[in-house]
Amino acid sequence: MLPEAAAMPRARLMERIPAYWRVPLLRLAGAWLALIALFFADWRDMAGQWWDSSTYNHILLIPPIIGWLVSQRLAAVLRLVPAGWWPGLVVFAGAAFLWMLGDFAGLSIARQLAAVVMLQGAFLALMGPRVAAAMLFPLFYMLFLVPAGDELIPFLQTLTAKITMVLLGLSHVPAIIDGVFITTPAGYFEVAEACSGVKFLIAMIAYGTLVSNVCFRSWPRRIAFMAVCLVTPIFANGVRAWGTIWIAGIRGIEFASSFDHVFYGWIFFAIVMALVMAAGWKFFDRAIDDPMIDIDKVQQSWLVDRLEPLRLGQNAALAALAGLVVLFVGWGSMANAMRAAVPTAIDVPDVPGWHLASDGARYPWMPLHTGADRRLILRYTDGSGSSVDVSYALYDAQMEGKEAGGFGQGALPMGSRWAWESDGPAFADGKSDVVQAPGPVHRLAVTRYRTGDLLTGSNAKLKLVNITDRLLLRSRPTAVLILSAEEGQAAPAPDLIHRFEAAIGPVPAWMDRMASVR
């Protein structure tokens, strides 16, 4: 192929782009590439989740979908004139600040959301409100690049279990529910995290949002279709769980498990999605040749007319974007370099009336404290032979990979056979959970976090204090204490933990002595 022939398509492409668009596009491309490079770790983590996690595999389709959405609007948008716009810098600054807070709190989802919103803010700052209005839906759809949804798993597990119980009752299958565990004559079943239905739900939300924009014009129809896309996967997952248990009663658990993975995993939800699409088909009110945007409305919009005068030179906007990045990344780097002093070792504390014992748990329980600088796990037994387990961890800082209250950390370790059953009885300044392992074995766990003068069972309160410390460039250690007891001992688990707390004295002082900070 001759060099001249290879250059022809590029030349034709440039001819299609008006001259007044070429430099702004280069500025935008440069800004986006620089942001992706600077926050590459977050984009790499997102891409890793898209590829490795079946919950987020559907996001691999989002970038080409966004490209297609842009292509459908491009010819009309090129009729507009891009211009710098200073309110876009406010959006960008907010996103950069959110990224820094997410970095301080070790919240990857906050950093990843911020990385996406920074691209949107840069677009606003460099292209202006009129171009942004024309590209509003593709810009909004970029939010689906953020792998979010795992936070819904506990709620969806509980909801699926309740739907399953209703369906079992309607089908006259006797069953007993205990949290997310269901016992029937066929066996003992758990609505596990993988069976929560979160994969189908978040994929359906992304799909429904796309269809609502592309296939509908009226907002009532869009809202109705989105409602169907929210309700249907939740109910369908309940049907899936019920069907698995019902089949287990006829053919056995092993057959039901295989059937679940093959039919429900690959076929059932495809059928449900097709049925939702078929149900909505006759209500589509956008003709196939309708333009995706009415560019005349965008040009005549009174709202955009009021916003557009807030202009800023594009070079000035680009410089301001760079300055904001330097400010927040530099601030975060200084905070990340700070570490609190922690003891070289933690002494095993004596507890009056209790003595150390070897592990005698009916089912192994090992809390997870990833990234902790010091940790202890001990079992104390009283004169009656009843035991309380103590898990203590100390961190010199809170950040990604060192999160006292991070996902899958603490009393319900990620990847274990333990599952959350219900909230436990109230304990002062603590979070109380009943967890369950196969057997079943029931265990009460009371979690408390300590940093500075704060003692709480709330992960949110801990995060807020940790974030404040980082904002003020203040370093303080963070400790987590979990007191736990199995049910089925000489006394109920809550009574055992209360007795143990009475023996150790004030919990804050006990935690501080172990951390050597008082």
Residue ranges of predicted features:
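Hydrophobic N-terminal alpha-helices or hydrophobic patches in metabolic proteins across all domains
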Residues: 2-518
